[in-house]
UniProtKB/Swiss-Prot annotation:
Its main location: membrane. One of its GO terms (molecular function) is proton-transporting ATP synthase activity, rotational mechanism. It comes from Burkholderia thailandensis (strain ATCC 700388 / DSM 13276 / CCUG 48851 / CIP 106301 / E264). PANTHER family: ATP SYNTHASE SUBUNIT ALPHA, MITOCHONDRIAL. This is ATP synthase subunit alpha 2. Gene3D superfamilies: 2.40.30.20, ATP synthase alpha/beta chain, C-terminal domain, P-loop containing nucleotide triphosphate hydrolases. CDD domains: ATP-synt_F1_alpha_C, ATP-synt_F1_alpha_N, F1-ATPase_alpha_CD. Belongs to the ATPase alpha/beta chains family. Coiled coil: none annotated. InterPro entries: ATP_synth_asu-like_sf, ATP_synth_asu_C, ATP_synth_asu_C_sf, ATP_synth_F1_a_nt-bd_dom, ATP_synth_F1_asu, ATPase_a/bsu_AS, ATPase_F1/V1/A1_a/bsu_N, ATPase_F1/V1/A1_a/bsu_N_sf. ATP binds at G177, D178, R179, A180, T181, G182, K183, T184.
Length: 556
């Protein structure tokens, strides 16, 4: 039935009246009281505020001029507020208001491939994040009943780690060692190796130089899958407050994917600098110092952070969040305060030794001090069987090698152990960005156990490792799980002597030709290293994708 003009006008009036009523319902009919605080003093990124007795711990406070901070400690008369922006414009008597909200960070797929600060603000020159999803940076760790056993391996592609110190999905494995021993390199190799997996990687940089972060981003863009990585960066030049919240923000970003049944990996580089920042803030806010001037809650701060890494039960989607925190030691002192705290919190540690690093063993993993407490249950059965005696044989070799410095060996059995140990050391010495598949690792270890590698020079192990994947692919049919056929793998390991002879012949031919091929390869490697080390020290934006892809390795 067609409406008359009068009926149409009445309907429009009714809609207008409904809109006006809705608008008026939001209008306060009486003055609204809002607590207003004042800055008493400000220095070193900390503002002491009075007049906000009802403020909550970790609540976001806003200063006149737009600067924000969060309540760090609550006293009777003053609140210490950690500033998240440069404190320019914040001075005594500046007005401060509450927001009633806690710190949150944007989360979601829109962050993949981006470089952001702990508040989600882009640092890569890209567009602002188009996501409305946020999570608090402080979230409770999953309860015991919500967790499941760690049963799946997180493949790093590094033979010594996968074979001896397996990391499981949902595990917390500490990477610890002196300065410049390859801690970040080992963690980045683990990230790069996820380029063919279903793991989302989050790299958190705390207090690092912008040039160092730039090199990490370039390495991931060049060798890994940057479209499945997120970089949360709080460089050394930013406010201490941003450095303090960075690891918590990184975990929240990763938990978004874990809670949806996916798998995530968080690398925190590094918690030693985070502990120093926490000590700095505590001393500035007059908290009582404890051992090594750290406040008494430093253990709790790191424990509540790392406990958020977990393997969730199937009822909650079965997702996992693995953590690779990094810590720095001073002169190899693992008994210092922060290292002992982190070792007791995590599920194991990979200890890097400066003497091994100086001896050109990369990664410089100390086999005697490293351990993985839960990852062994997640190790692939074929790899577990192949690496059964590896640790014992290598430990015996290191002990025998120390004695051989005082004289020669006449016992044939001891000479055989030395020979085997030299091949083991050559196997576990692995260049960066040369990840091995689990299949490659199993065949190499089986060939080692069968004595196939004993007759070859240790110098030929590296070219053998490079040519092994294509050799295996040509001889193995592509079933769904080629690691299940143990008999076929054992036969391949025993017949690898064919490849060994070919590698030895090629090496002899190059030596006869004057080593031109090696010189050319060294020149190319030096060019890549020089390109990798270059860059603006003040910018952390990655290099353009076109330049990064030009040197990308062939995918296997």
């Amino acid at each position: 039935m067609t409406q008359t003009p009068d009926a149409t006008g009445a309907a429009a009036d009714a809609r207008w009246l409904a809109r006006r009523r809705g608008a008026l319902a939001c209008v306060a009919l009486a003055p609204v009281a809002q607590a207003l605080g004042r800055v008493e003093r400000v220095a070193d990124g900390i503002a002491f505020v009075s007049g906000l007795e009802d403020a909550m711990l970790n609540e976001v406070l806003r200063f006149d001029g737009g600067v924000t901070g969060f309540a760090h400690t609550l006293d009777e008369d003053l609140i210490s507020v950690v500033l998240l922006d440069p404190d320019a414009g914040v001075q005594a008597q500046t007005a401060v208001t509450r927001t009633g909200a806690v710190l949150e960070v944007p989360v979601g797929p829109q962050l993949l491939g981006r470089v952001v600060d702990p508040l989600g603000r882009p640092l890569d020159g890209g567009a602002p994040l188009g996501t409305a999803d946020t999570l608090p940076i402080e979230r409770p760790a999953p309860e015991i009943i919500e967790r499941d056993l760690v049963s799946e391996p997180l493949d790093t592609g590094v033979l010594i780690v996968d074979a001896l110190f397996t990391i499981g999905r949902g595990q917390r494995e500490l990477i610890i060692g002196d300065r410049a021993t390859g801690k970040t390199s080992l963690a980045i190799d683990a990230i790069v190796n996820q380029r063919h997996s279903d793991v989302i990687c989050v790299y958190v940089a705390i207090g690092q130089r912008a040039s160092a972060v730039r090199r990490v981003i370039d390495a991931v863009r060049r060798y890994g899958a940057p479209e499945r990585c997120i970089f949360v960066v709080a460089p050394a030049a930013c406010a201490p407050g941003l450095q303090w919240i960075a690891p918590f923000a990184g975990f929240s970003v990763a938990e978004y994917f874990r809670d949806r049944g996916q798998h995530a990996l968080v690398v925190v580089d590094d918690l030693t600098k985070h502990a120093a920042t926490h000590r700095e803030l505590a001393l500035l806010t007059r908290e009582p110092p404890g051992r090594e001037a750290y406040p008494g809650d430093i253990f709790y701060v790191h424990a509540r952070l790392l406990e958020r890494a977990a393997k969730l039960s199937a009822k909650l989607g079965g997702g996992s969040l693995s953590a690779l925190p990094i810590a720095e030691t001073d002169a190899g002192n693992l008994a210092a305060y922060i290292p002992t705290n982190l070792i007791s919190i995590t599920d194991g540690q990979i200890v890097l030794d400066s003497a091994l690093f100086a001896a050109n063993q990369r990664p410089a993993v100390d086999v005697g001090l490293s351990v993985s407490r839960v990852g062994g249950k997640a190790q692939h059965p074929a790899l577990r069987a192949a690496s059964g005696r590896l640790r014992l044989d290598y430990a015996q070799f290191l002990e025998l090698e120390a004695f051989t410095r005082f004289g020669g060996l006449t016992d044939a059995r001891l000479r055989a152990q030395i020979t085997r140990g030299e091949r083991i050391r050559a196997l576990i010495t692995q260049p960066r960005f040369r990840a091995l598949r689990t299949l490659d690792e199993v065949v190499l270890l089986k060939a080692l156990a069968a004595g196939v590698l004993d007759a070859m020079s240790p110098d030929l192990v590296a070219p053998l490792r490079e040519r092994l994947p294509s050799w295996l692919d040509a001889r193995l049919a592509p079933p769904r799980d080629r690691l299940a056929d143990d008999a076929a793998l054992s036969m391949l390991a025993e017949s690898i002597g064919e490849l060994v002879e070919r590698v030895a012949a090629d090496a002899a031919h190059r030596a006869a030709a004057g080593g031109h091929a090696e010189d050319a390869a060294d020149d190319m490697g030096g060019a890549l290293d020089g390109e990798h080390a270059s860059g603006d020290a003040t910018s952390i934006a990655p290099t353009p994708p076109g330049g990064a892809e030009a040197g990308a390795p062939r995918k296997r």
